[in-house]
Amino acid sequence: RKNNAYFEKDEHGNRLPYLEAIAITFLPDKQSEFLQFVQGNLDFLNSLDASYKDELLTNDGRLRDTYTESVNMIRGPYLNTEYLGFYLDSKTPEIQSELIRKAINYGFDRQKMMIYLRNGIGNPAHGGFIPIGLQGHDASLGFTYQPDKAKQLVEQFKKESGISNPEITLTTTSNYLSFCEFIQRELEKAGLIINLDVMPEATLRTARSNGKVDMFRSSWVADYLDAENYLSIFYSKNFAPNGSNYFHYKNTQFDSLYNKAF
């Protein structure tokens, strides 16, 4: 409901908010959600789902002519990072290997993935875990697409480990299967076999929290506008299942700097 005592005003001096109330609806089926939107039963969608992206957008991310009169599309940085996570307490040699983890980061083209699987909606995460639009994002961090480097790292792992056909199981949900299949094909070129395991969101969430999956696709959406919200999931005292450090990542220097940031 509207807060009649809210203090802010717009640039013309009109008191905010404009609306009397907002009704929020949660629909588990994304296609049903889009249908409700097209029929005028919903006023706003906050994300783009693969099930209807090609109906709504052209290949280069513009609204199709059918919707230009009825839909106002606003594009901007969204405080959400999609990522691949490694469970570092796994006994799997490939997961334990920094060579393989780096090879995965170098081995697939994030820009191409955004163009073909999201119609250009989204930014390739070349600048680390903190997303564009939030203070702390640094475009010089992270990994760029270097397929030859990825192949070199996989070959180095083979020589050092004696494992001639390295492979990892990547767990995902059906909504993100196309992303994971893209990554699977790209990494096969580098000599790394990626097996895909698809499960329901609730099942994956439980398995991820309890360290039952070696590698998984997930996302992190900011609860508040501070980079600490993203860095907190790497803090060693936040180990899952009691916290959000699903990776069981532990680094003494990181923990020290994280604490000093407060």
Q: Which residues does each predicted region cover?
A:
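Short helix-initiation/N-cap motifs at beta->coil->alpha
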Residues: I24-L35, A50-S51, S174-N175, D197-T206
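Periplasmic solute-binding protein
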Residues: R75-T92, S97, N105
